[in-house]
Amino acid sequence: MSKKASMHKEEKHEKGQHKQPADEQPLGIDPEVSSGEASEGACQESDAKVQELEKALEEAQQQAEKYRGEMMRFAADFENFRKQKERELQAAGTRSIENTIRELLPLVDDMKRVMEHAPDDLEQSGEARPYLEGVELLWKNLLKWFERKGVKQIEACGQKLDVNFHEAITQVDHPDAEPDTVIEEYQTGYVMGDKVLRHAKVIVAR
């Protein structure tokens, strides 16, 4: 055998000795142990993420509940404010009507006196009669407007004196009336709902 062939054979032998099988793992590394550690680490990381998300969700729910409570309080406060303003506006409107009616009452009294005390010859006069009829029509229209606003006349004649509605200006002897009975109305009184706009001025039996 030639020297060259002998050297080639030795090289092939050395290469064969250093070649590592495909399925052989590096020394000191257990495939099963390495895989288990990686899986355990992944589970721990996943659990940490879940706990972090659960904590964030709990905080978000608490914050949402806080905002919900604040919104409910705000809505309740706004509703109370709205109702209060409605009551104030209604009360202001009622006071305005009351003041207007009080200012009109003397005019109503004057028209009533004109009709009650007009001389018979004046009522029969062709020239004066249209004016008296006009006064009467205006008086009735005012009373109708009063009724639409909830204003009513206070009953007086024949009633027992009630200081809540009547103001006695004098007392007189009367054979047919019981004591403290209203026998004459001097000035008509008016109420609006349960509020007295003006007491009826009356004469009562002694």
Curated annotation (Swiss-Prot):
Identify the stretch annotated as signal peptide in this record: none
Q: Name one GO cellular component term.
A: cytoplasm
The cross-references to InterPro entries, in alphabetical order and at most eight, read: GrpE, GrpE_coiled_coil, GrpE_head
Extract the Pfam families matched here. Answer: GrpE
- Biological process (GO) annotations? protein folding
Q: Which domain of life is it from?
A: Bacteria
| CDD domains to which the protein is assigned, alphabetical | GrpE
Recorded hits in PANTHER family, A to Z, give:
GRPE PROTEIN, GRPE PROTEIN HOMOLOG, MITOCHONDRIAL
Q: Which family does it belong to?
A: Belongs to the GrpE family.
Stated role: Participates actively in the response to hyperosmotic and heat shock by preventing the aggregation of stress-denatured proteins, in association with DnaK and GrpE. It is the nucleotide exchange factor for DnaK and may function as a thermosensor. Unfolded proteins bind initially to DnaJ; upon interaction with the DnaJ-bound protein, DnaK hydrolyzes its bound ATP, resulting in the formation of a stable complex. GrpE releases ADP from DnaK; ATP binding to DnaK triggers the release of the substrate protein, thus completing the reaction cycle.
Name listed for the protein in its UniProt record: Protein GrpE
Q: Which organism is it from?
A: Prosthecochloris aestuarii (strain DSM 271 / SK 413)
Organism lineage string: Bacteria, Pseudomonadati, Chlorobiota, Chlorobiia, Chlorobiales
